[in-house]
Amino acid sequence: MASGTATATLSLARYRVTFEAIEPLALLEYLGSTLRGAFGHAFRELCCPARPGEACPMPAACAYHLVFETAPPPDSPALRTHEEIPRPFVIAPPPASADEYRRGDHVVFDLTLIGRAREFLPHFVVTLREVDGLGRGRRRVRLAKIEAVDPLREVSETVFVGDEALVRPVDLGVTFDECAAVRSPGAAIRVAFLTQTRLKHDAGFVRRPDFHVLFRRLLGRLSSLARFHCGAPLDLDFRGLIERAQAVRLVSDDTRWTAWTRYSSRQDRRMEWTGLVGSATYEGDLAVFWPYLLFGQWTHVGKGATFGLGSYRVEGAE
């Protein structure tokens, strides 16, 4: 199992956000990308001093750039192995979110802030209050509630209620080391892929979720998040962990490759989202991997994790 000093930097906080539809609204695109677009636009307007079309004069201190356009130091050696730096947040709508909402219906999603992004909670709350339209025609919505959620202990506290001005600075943070203290379920686990999971290996996306591929992509994501957003790189035997992952067997594969098409208002064209959904069962010496898998449930894994793809749930299978 990873030592505390090796992984102590990894931390996150999770929030449940509820919007109320003031008028009926229809979503032509995946809810995660809709929310990310509306949220990013409002965040930039509120938090970045640059005018539209201009470069930010102080990107190293700008909350928008640190969260949405993360850039490494110019001399960062990590650029050689990281094609894209992950953003320190995840917008995760329910896997079966609706396409249409009536007046009074709730649009609910989870927002995970990772590492230093937790310090920007006030910026996120103010931005969410400014999101006043979603979907086709930007139908009116209002922020109804934000709750801090501890997914490890299954408790929650109110951060904001729509008819109040008070914002409570609640952070029910979860650390990697707290996940490492949770007992491994045994020699068999089941991973349920809840949203399209896009695992890239050997220059292509895999359609068979071999454990070593899943773990490689998860370890790479956690390593990047630690390096760029949590203050320090992970001090781990990466090669040794991957070699051990190759010994874990895929004993049941109930996944399928799925695709669905949604309109992208940002790109003004239809986009196809593809990936694995379903479940896979693995057997082997799994104890060392358990905390990574547990923590990774809230960071997601694979391409598109920032707006909700790569969501999974892990549990014992014995």
Regions found by a protein language model. Name each.
Residues M1-E318:
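RNA-interacting cores
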